[in-house]
Design a protein with these regions (language model features):
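Aromatic- and acid-rich polysaccharide-binding/catalytic face
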Residues: 44, 49, 82-92, 142-172, ...
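Substrate-binding cleft of secreted/luminal carbohydrate-active enzymes
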Residues: 160-169, 192-263
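The substrate-binding groove and active-site-proximal loops of carbohydrate-active enzymes
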Residues: 12-31, 90-106, 131, 159-170, ...
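Aromatic- and acidic-residue-enriched segments that line the glycan-binding/catalytic groove
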Residues: 1-14, 48-88, 138
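Alpha-helical scaffolding within the catalytic cores
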Residues: 135-151, 171-183, 210-211
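Aromatic-lined carbohydrate-recognition surfaces of secreted/lumenal glycan-active proteins
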Residues: 47-51, 96-143, 188-200
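Conserved, mostly hydrophobic/aromatic
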Residues: 30, 37, 46, 116, ...
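Active-site-adjacent "subsite" loops/lids of carbohydrate-active enzymes
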Residues: 1-41, 81-95, 110, 206-208
Length: 267
């Protein structure tokens, strides 16, 4: 239904194969789906995984080279923009467009999270955004780049940032982690950092230990990994997937052991 409510390229007016989450029909559809899950299962939370506007260009580069084209400039977005700002939505992104996209992108997640919390306050809501740093790591104005807007949502419990490639410098890991923890604390959320468990393994598995030590030392509340068993047997499997999976598990046990020991001392 409502297949016309899709995202549109700003430069070419091409209708893309992605729903526009600023249309009321998709917002209703998404909220209703999530509510059905909450009402008919014993799920304990929801995870908003790297939400973002579509890329008219089909790829992104590590240095942010996905081009200048953007979405969404569909009839619904154009109408909302003009009603708010008093002029036609431009094809070239300006500051008003950036603000509009940030603001509108949050509506679907905020409204759905609110409905879920009203149904069951115990549901844990996590929002995971891309681990960007200026324009270095595929920022490309995805729509959720304003971390303050995301982390300040009163219906989110956990502020999470995505996986970082093992090939990137340690300083980048530290910078993203520092910002993640700071943003979570600012808005009284738990912080979460991810460990890369697919595609590429670190050259030395000791990098896993270092990353976990870094996250722990910087006050990260939660650690997460994708994907299961290093993607073993899938097209995204890491080199030596089971060895990587085992190393990640060893670090989880190590961190949990330290936490349990600390709890025993406090009690």
């Amino acid at each position: 239904n409502n297949i016309h409510n899709r995202q549109v390229s700003a430069f070419t007016d091409e209708v893309l194969n992605f729903a526009c989450f600023n249309t009321q029909s998709f917002r209703d559809y998404f909220r209703n789906c999530c509510m059905k899950i909450a009402q008919n299962t014993e799920v304990d939370g929801f995870f908003w995984d790297e939400p973002h506007y579509a890329y008219p260009k089909s790829y992104a580069s590590i240095t942010g080279g996905a081009g200048d084209d953007w979405s969404c400039r569909c009839p619904v977005c154009k109408k909302k923009f003009e009603e708010y700002y008093g002029y036609e939505m431009p094809r070239i992104m300006n500051d008003d467009v950036k603000q509009f996209r940030w603001r509108e992108a949050m509506v679907i997640l905020r409204e759905t999270s609110k409905a879920l919390k009203e149904y069951n306050p115990a549901l844990e809501i996590t929002c995971c955004v891309h681990a960007t740093l200026n324009t270095y790591y595929v920022t490309e104005l995805r729509g959720y780049d304003n971390w303050d807007l995301v982390a300040s949502c009163p219906y989110f419990d956990v502020f999470s940032t995505t996986i970082i490639s093992w090939d990137l410098p340690e300083k980048f890991f530290a910078d993203v982690t520092e910002r993640t923890v700071r943003m979570a604390k600012k808005y009284n959320k738990q912080s979460e950092r991810w460990i890369m468990g697919y595609n590429k393994s670190p050259k030395d598995l000791a990098q896993v230990d270092k990353a976990v030590d870094l996250y722990e030392s910087m006050g990260v509340d939660r650690l997460a990994t994708w994907t299961y068993r290093g993607g073993y047997g899938t097209v995204v499997q890491a080199e030596n997937p089971l060895a990587l999976w085992d190393r990640i598990g060893e670090n989880y046990r190590r961190v949990r052991g330290k936490q349990e020991e600390a709890q025993e001392k406090r009690s």
